[in-house]
């Protein structure tokens, strides 16, 4: 039995996996059919299904890229709202946002929470979401069971990610695909992380981390019980250096630095190294084309529950509905 200490609610681990078979998503002019969650592909769903007490936290600061990103964001919110209709969606905003952004949030029943004025100067939105998310969760802790920390336009939900997580869990997504080469300055895909670490924590620290065979965490997705998430965000907030809060990449570098240093052990942070539950930019096995297409994880017959990036662009160009 898993206890939610904030609400007194108990969660019982399911003796058998929840009943899932295949997921069909009908897209205008395109069908995504037969996503496989049968038998062993359904074993990942061990916990209660998502309810309105489960929250996905997003953040947004307006940029000139809004018109370009609007289509992607519409697709992502269409998907999450169809897959998780009961979940509470919360958007933490920084500064003024355009009217069509507000309309999009209203369309998908997303609660908008404006940030205090103190975050309008000296803060990048991705860094500000650490203290903003912490404050929101502390204020509403008694109303929340589980919480997902999610990027806004390129995290794709194909099934109930909350049913894979217990109240005492805290799981973060790894960005590296290969567990043997996750933080190498000579590896093109990870070079940015190396130089971020150099910039924020020094050359010696960056080179030291190239010797570790541990994953590079991605700042775009994590999920867990609300108490665990509050513990993590409290630690991140305490360790933030004010002179870097305006710089892109600092939030993720801070997360990785604390993880490598072993300072998140007490928080109980686990890392998902690209499994069926979640994966960053996984290369999918795509079967079919035209009006009938399905996909699974590379090297598996099982469909992913959640992807961060990695979804074929031709699917994102369509309007999504369920059948």
Question: Residue spans of the language-model regions?
Answer:
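N-terminal anchoring/stem segment of glycosyltransferases
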Residues: 1-128, 132-144, 227
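PAPS-dependent sulfotransferase catalytic domain
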Residues: 172-221, 252
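A short acidic, often aromatic-flanked loop/helix-cap motif at beta-alpha or helix-coil junctions
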Residues: 118-125, 179-180, 274-280, 314
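A short acidic (Asp/Glu
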Residues: 100-103, 157-162, 233-234, 256-257
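Catalytic core and acceptor-binding pocket of nucleotide-sugar-dependent glycosyltransferases
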Residues: 202-322
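Conserved beta-strand elements of beta-rich interaction domains across eukaryotes
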Residues: 63, 96, 154-155, 162-163, ...
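GT-A fold catalytic core of metal-dependent nucleotide-sugar glycosyltransferases
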Residues: 130-186
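Short His-Asn-centered micro-motif
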Residues: 58-61, 91-95, 150-152, 173-175, ...
């Amino acid at each position: 039995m898993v206890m939610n200490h904030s609400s007194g609610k108990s969660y019982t681990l399911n003796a058998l996996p929840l009943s899932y078979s295949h997921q069909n998503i009908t897209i205008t002019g395109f069908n995504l059919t037969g996503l496989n969650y049968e038998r062993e592909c359904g074993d990942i769903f061990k916990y209660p299904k998502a309810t309105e007490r489960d929250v996905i936290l997003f953040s947004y600061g307006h940029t000139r890229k809004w018109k370009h990103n609007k289509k992607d964001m519409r697709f992502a919110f269409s998907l999450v709202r169809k897959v998780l209709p009961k979940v509470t969606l919360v958007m933490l905003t920084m500064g003024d946002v355009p009217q069509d952004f507000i309309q999009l949030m209203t369309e998908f029943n997303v609660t908008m929470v404006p940030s205090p004025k103190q975050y309008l100067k000296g803060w990048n939105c991705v860094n500000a979401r650490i203290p903003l998310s912490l404050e929101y969760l502390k204020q509403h802790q008694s109303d929340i069971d589980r919480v997902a920390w999610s990027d806004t336009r390129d995290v794709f939900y194909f099934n109930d990610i909350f049913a894979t997580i217990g109240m005492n869990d805290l799981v973060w997504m790894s960005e590296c695909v290969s567990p043997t080469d996750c933080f190498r300055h000579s590896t093109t895909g990870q070079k940015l992380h190396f130089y971020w670490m150099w910039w924020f924590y020094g050359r010696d620290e960056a080179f030291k981390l190239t010797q570790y065979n541990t994953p590079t965490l991605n700042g775009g997705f994590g999920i867990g019980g609300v108490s665990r998430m509050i513990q993590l965000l409290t630690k991140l907030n305490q360790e933030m250096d004010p002179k870097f809060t305006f710089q892109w990449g600092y939030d993720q570098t801070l997360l990785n630095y604390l993880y490598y240093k072993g300072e998140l052990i007490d928080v109980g942070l686990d890392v998902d190294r690209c499994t069926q539950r979640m994966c960053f930019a996984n290369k999918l096995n795509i079967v079919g084309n035209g009006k009938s297409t399905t996909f699974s994880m590379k090297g598996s017959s099982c469909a992913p529950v959640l992807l961060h990036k990695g979804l074929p662009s031709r699917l994102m160009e369509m309007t999504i509905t369920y059948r």
